[in-house]
Amino acid sequence: MSDYNRSPIVNPIPTSILLIFFGIILVEAFLIFGFGGPLGKTETTIERLTLVQNYGVPPNLATWMFETGNFSIDYVSRFIVYPFINLSGLSVVFAAVLLLALGKMVGEFFSSFSVILIWLLSTLFAAFFYSISATDEQILVGSFPGIYGFVGAYTF
């Protein structure tokens, strides 16, 4: 008998990474299959822009919230929801690949709770500092701030 251990066909990915991954993919699937298919009809583009406008983090949002004292769920939720909305399908593909690759590496060294915490804190800090320091009128959306947090965690 041999002690040969077969490696799995697909490397196991931590559950916490899969939860984040499916959150990103579900939003994109809603946009693609709910509004006319993968070729990017006008309805898909309009709905994507509506999501960006309603759930992205605009510049000076945090400053405005502190000045007015308005911490309603509509504004606070933007800091948590924005990483699940991407500007294009290609952005989703790159974000998904980087998330799975870096998330697997980080998930091997940290617990699932720590991985979720790294993702959440990276996106929250990125949104907060963007909203108090941005000078242009671009709205912050996309999964990359959380992925950059995984880069930092992996190099740690």
Predicted regions and their residues:
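Alpha-helical transmembrane segments of multipass membrane proteins
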Residues: M105, L124-I132, Y154
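Membrane-interface micro-motifs in multi-pass membrane enzymes
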Residues: Q138-F156
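Cytoplasmic-side transmembrane-helix entry/capping segments in multi-pass membrane proteins
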Residues: F113-L121, G142-I147
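Residue-level recognition of pore/gate-forming positions within transmembrane alpha-helices
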Residues: I25, S122-T123
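N-terminal TM1-TM2 helical hairpin plus the immediately adjacent luminal interfacial "cap"
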Residues: E28-I116, S133-L140
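Hydrophobic alpha-helical transmembrane segments
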Residues: I17-F22, V93, I116-L120
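Alpha-helical transmembrane segments and their helix-start/interface "positive-inside/aromatic belt" motifs
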Residues: S7-G23
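Active-site His/Glu-centered metal-binding helix of metallohydrolases
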Residues: V93, V97, F128, I147
